[in-house]
Amino acid sequence: MAYNRLGSPQRDGPYSPSAQPQYDSRSPSPGRPLQPYIHPDEAYARQQPLHLQMPTASDDRLAMQPTYSVENVHNPQAYGQQYGQHLPDSGDMGYGRNDYIVSPEEHHDAYYTQPYSPHPQGDYALDPYPSHDEPYRPDTDNVPILQPDSAYGPDPHTQPGMDYDDYQEEPRPTPSPAPIRRWKTVKEVQLFNGNLVLDCPVPPKLLANVPHAKPPERDEFTHMRYSAATCDPSDFHNERFTLRQRLFAKPRQTELFIVVTMYNEDEFLFARTMIGVFKNIEFMCNRSSSKTWGKEAWKKIVVCIVSDGRAKINPRTRAVLAGLGVYQDGIAKQQVNGKDVTAHIYEYTTQVGLELKGTQVSLKPRSATPVQLLFCLKEKNQKKINSHRWFFQAFGRVLDPNICVLIDAGTKPGKDSIYQLWKAFDLEPMCGGACGEIKVMLDHGKKLLNPLVATQNFEYKMSNILDKPLESAFGFISVLPGAFSAYRYVALQNDKNGVGPLEKYFKGETMHADAGVFTANMYLAEDRILCFELVSKRNCRWILQYVKSATGETDVPDRIPEFVLQRRRWLNGSFFAAVYAVAHVYQLWRSDHSFLRKLMFLIEFTYQTINMLFAWFAIGNFFLVFRLLTASLGTKETLGTAGTVLGVVFEFVYLGTLLYCFILSMGNRPQGNPKSYMMMVIFWSVLMVWLTFASIFLTVKSIETEVQQKDFSFSTIFNNSTFFGLIVSLASTYVLWFVASFLFFDPWHMFTCFLQYIVLTPTYINVLNIYAFCNTHDITWGTKGDDKAEKLPSANVKPGGKVDVLIPQDDGDLNAQYDSELKKFATKPPKEVKAPNPADKQEDYYKSFRSNVVTAWMITNFILVAAVLNIAGFDRINVHDTQQQNSTIYLAVILWSVAGLSLFRFTGACWFLVVRMVSLEIWSVCKV
């Protein structure tokens, strides 16, 4: 394995003999071999680019970054001064360029340290080399570290009119006669273009378990890079932030850029996802015959982890990240030079793997394949779409990847699924996006015992067997699941006017405050908007594909309240996004798709419009089917009076449950009324069993009726409208499901989940749809309030342009901190008991009482009206036409009741007058 040196003082450095043969005869110093000579009182003038042959060292060498380093080098003044001479001036920053290894002048502007002349610009005597035996000497603030004309700006002490007498410097540590440790950290570093960027040594305990460069050499395995981003994601590049992949002697080209977005997932869910990602990278590294991949494939892959809020991240998950080496506590800052930090960015190439033993996460040192990790810890909780902004707009612009893979924490990709997604783009140049099969995590089938999980498993399977392949055949998939999908980075880019897929996609982050309800609900399914905008992109012809061989496993809700809340967002977002796509179908004609492809798109959108109409009228259609089937059971040929009575009972309970569902959905949280929702689910399940029985019973009765006829033939059976309608509808759904499942060699869900799905179908139609449409005003993403994170120290600029950084001081501190993080997930977490918020509990109680009162009020009034008017089933029970008679009697009762009540009130009023008159008379007598 080739190690990527950060700039050894002895090998591959710009001061080494290999870089400058003319200095090969110089004798090494006792302190630091071949250390350049620096006079302490005068900074060197800016050097002219040297037209020399660049060193023939490894392309993976990282350039020395003096102002980034938090290590106590022997001559920090010269160290920073040297870097000041090579400060990048161009705005290009080397992004997307590959010729720096050939052109020293251009590479000079990409943070690479050029060969350095050891001669000072003045006639000062040369200082001797610093020695390890010297005691600690603090920096002198009145000596400029950088050139007056450097990009950091002139030294404040040289500015006329600047007074720093009021500045109180922190006390310096007492000088110690002990030798300086090489890895001893310092408290002061220079800001780089106003940005705080640190190269921090990783704990020696971690290094002891992985291959790495031996001291005094440094590589990407020995140091973690921290950047305190103080800007919006869209300004990350313009603020001259960069990433480690662009700092190698030959900047690495990123073929695969993988993002794992998380909120507060525990260490088990996070490790499950990362294990799947690591296995995919290892799989690609083992493809020795591939032209793209192979042994060094890991250098073309960057794994980005974006956590939505520093106060929200699970501490045990953060400890796992520290175990991997991509996080260190105590380094992050709240502010830098008065600017709030928006994201904390940690970079490290880890060789530590993860493994799961049950639900216990443990580290697996000396992993065969290194992985380039980029951990972005956002300061505030700003939703998942903001996490994607950091991924696409900030980091994507720097790395310029080919393919971007999106994964949610908790989703476990198959061992080669990411490769299969990449392969789809490689085989089809016009593939702009792709998705794999989302599977339900069943825990070896144990979770199928929960009917709700089994139903969702069936739903996912049939979607991946019927819906996704159909849409992929047309070239447009209505939604690429954000849990596991991939996009071609160039296909997502906006045009020169800033209009394009990403512009539409990210509009949902800031528009909720002033957008209409329709638009806000539409952006609950922002991934659907992205898919449509990608296919209809102006002057392009991108298509979307489904990759059956790429799989990702995920958990699904196993309780009714969580299930209802999840589907509320899905249903509202998908419905309004579908309306948007149908209304903007004309945009397809501005693309460069062929006429045949556009015609196929129109056919697909027509199909989706029909599906949307069926979804809109699903509740009405279901009631009509129920009404017709129950009415058919009341005939003499079927169940007679018993069927009629059962039909009336079911109809009353049906309408009452439907009404109760509306009332609950209008103002109650599912978490506050779990028993009520469970009762509704049970009723709809019983009703579906009744309807299934009715369908089978009517079919059998129809066949018996035809068989009993003298002129019976098989053709007469199909002439029976009842039989023919039932058979055609059942065969076109259930039978085709079986056939399609066998064609895809994936039929097992038909045997393990089919019945559960059939029984819970009314719940999907009634409960989920009613709750979704009754809560279209709720445009939240399920993101809870932003908790206040623990305040971090700030990095304030001191005279001389330096800031204080308080980090672990030595190996012992680093190891102690590392051990502390490992202990956080070394044992099983205590069982989490969610204590209900007292305020929420009281509010749920009040809302539940209100809903029950309103329900009782409406149902009793409905029964009264139905009984009097002989409707809602009473007309079927009472065969005589008694509607007029009942109405007359009821009207008479009402009139006499009104008269009686009026007479009663009149009597009371008269009695009041009598009492009043008598009282007045008595009062007058007594007064006299």
Curated annotation (Swiss-Prot):
One of its GO terms (biological process) is cell wall organization. Keywords: Cell membrane, Cell wall biogenesis/degradation, Glycoprotein, Glycosyltransferase, Membrane, Transferase, Transmembrane, Transmembrane helix, Virulence. InterPro entries: Chitin_synth (IPR004835), Chitin_synth_fun (IPR004834), Chitin_synth_N (IPR013616). Its main location: membrane. GO terms for molecular function: chitin synthase activity. It is a multi-pass membrane protein. Induction: The expression levels changes little with temperature change, regardless of whether the exposure to the higher temperature is for 3 h or 24 h. Its EC number is 2.4.1.16. Residues 130-140 have a biased composition (Basic and acidic residues). Belongs to the chitin synthase family. Class I subfamily. This is Chitin synthase 2. The gene is CHS2.
